Amino acid sequence: MNGDYDRKFPQARALYAYMAAHPGKKLNFMGNEIAHFREWDEKREQDWNLLDFPKHREFAAYMQALNHLYLSEEALWNDYSGNGFEWVHAVSQNYPDTEHSCVFAWKRRSENGRQLLCVFQFADRADCVTLPLSEDEKPELVFDTDWTEFGGAAPKQDEVLTAQNGRAVTKMAAFSAKFFVVGKRDEAETEADEIKPEQKADTEVTADELITAEPIEKLSENSSVKLVDGAWFDRAVVYHIYPLGYCGAPQYNEGEKTQGSRILKVLDRIGHLKALGVNTIYFGPVFESLWHGYDTSDYYRTDSRLGSM
């Protein structure tokens, strides 16, 4: 693996997850399960002393959990039919052009119809990955290579992807993979996510009633509005602008000097925002820098309840 000691482990976890999810039978040499540094050698035993180090113990626990997942999910090993594999068009926020994208996704299916959505992110920084998803699908996270129990940074917790206009977004750590079991949403869940027509009857926006846009710095000047991981306060919302329309942002052209008011003109679902009671959208003044690889994810948040713009 490339990089220093700490960076090798997430890469190895992502690689073995890719191997487990890829069609075909698996072969691992002894020693791989403890992140051996040297080649397997039939003339000497493994360097079991590596398990004295936390990183290697965590990696051994990871390999054990991955093997258990492989055995328990028939879709991963019952691969005798071409119907058991389907590519999924995953889009990277950091590299929206497919030539430089480091994200991949596919579905594995078992003969009994159970589906596993496998998402991979092989770049060296966190990314926001957009996936196509039908409204009745309910992918639930069952495995994340970045969980802390494996030596990663993400606490083990539930994650359920929700479709907005046929797309869903998941945040991926650098060199990571996620596996989701794809179930079906029941009618009650679907109805709860929908906005009733009568609720938005009086919320259409006219040309003279554009939602205001302000620099995000004003958040600190307004005591009635507070940003906490994208939560809403006083009917205001922070909306993260990404290039090329991915992750639910409006589209704009590279090189264009974009102002908040001009962004608002291309929003095609203003009425949807008004129906949710949103009167103000705060835009960060970072449009041009996004084109030069500046990662603003630590400073701006997207509230997924907005839906896709």
What would you call each of these model-derived segments?
Residues M1:
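Active-site core of glycosidic bond-cleaving carbohydrate-active enzymes
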